[in-house]
Curated annotation (Swiss-Prot):
Natural source organism: Bos taurus (Bovine)
Organism taxonomic ancestry: Eukaryota, Metazoa, Chordata, Craniata, Vertebrata
Nucleotide-binding as UniProt keyword: no
Record function comment: Histone-binding protein required for histone H4 methyltransferase activity of PRMT5. Specifically required for histone H4 'Arg-3' methylation mediated by PRMT5, but not histone H3 'Arg-8' methylation, suggesting that it modulates the substrate specificity of PRMT5. Specifically interacts with the N-terminus of histone H4 but not with histone H3, suggesting that it acts by promoting the association between histone H4 and PRMT5. Involved in CCNE1 promoter repression.
Keywords for this protein: Acetylation, Chromatin regulator, Nucleus, Phosphoprotein, Transcription, Transcription regulation
PANTHER family in alphabetical order: COORDINATOR OF PRMT5 AND DIFFERENTIATION STIMULATOR
Protein name listed in UniProt: Coordinator of PRMT5 and differentiation stimulator
Length: 185
């Protein structure tokens, strides 16, 4: 079942969905008294063959007003109706009617929040944390290495600017006497 039909049936819509309708098994069979006239599709088949030939020869697309599409069928094939109104003649709920286009809702100034900085400063007077405390916290959050930097004379140590090596390097190893005595046994 195609998505428009499934959506219409799931929502219980009374209106039939637009677009190319495929026969389903639940439709009522034609009445026995109905006579079928043979339809002449030879002109449509020739136009379709011509359009296919043009596409095979390198055409990027075929315009909708070409004879390859039947009259008035190109919109139904794509799933769009030619007019913007439903089959009952009423505009869709997401569209504005022609008379309502100038009556758009306007933003009201009363909806905006008004800041009173003086009132906020008075409220913050009893706050034990002042702006310096807040700035100090922010600088440590942004630059966490600041708290680890030495405060005295700056001596260059390359280990501050490089990640630690995967294999530890010991420049000076000191062994205690008797440290490896049990390893020899």
């Amino acid at each position: 079942m195609d998505p428009p039909t499934a959506g219409a049936q799931s929502l219980g819509a009374a209106e039939q969905p637009r677009g190319l309708q495929l026969p389903s098994g639940r439709e009522a069979p034609p009445s026995p008294g109905t006579a079928f006239a043979p339809a002449d599709h030879s002109s449509q088949e020739k136009a379709t063959e011509n359009a296919t030939d043009r596409l095979a020869n390198g055409a990027q697309s075929i315009p909708h007003d070409s004879p390859a599409h039947g009259e008035g069928t190109h919109c139904e094939e794509e799933g769009f109706a030619e007019d913007d109104e439903d089959s009952d003649g009423e505009p869709s709920p997401w569209e504005l009617s022609e008379g309502m286009s100038g009556c758009l809702p306007k933003e009201q100034a009363g909806d905006l929040f008004h800041e009173d900085w003086d009132l906020e400063l008075k409220a913050d007077q009893g706050n034990p944390y002042d702006a310096d405390d807040i700035q100090g916290c922010l600088s440590q959050e942004v630059r966490p290495w600041v708290c680890c930097a030495p405060q005295g004379d700056m001596i260059y140590d390359p280990s501050w600017h490089h990640p630690p090596p995967l294999i530890p390097h010991y420049s000076k190893m000191v062994f205690e006497t008797g440290q490896f005595d049990d390893a020899e046994d």
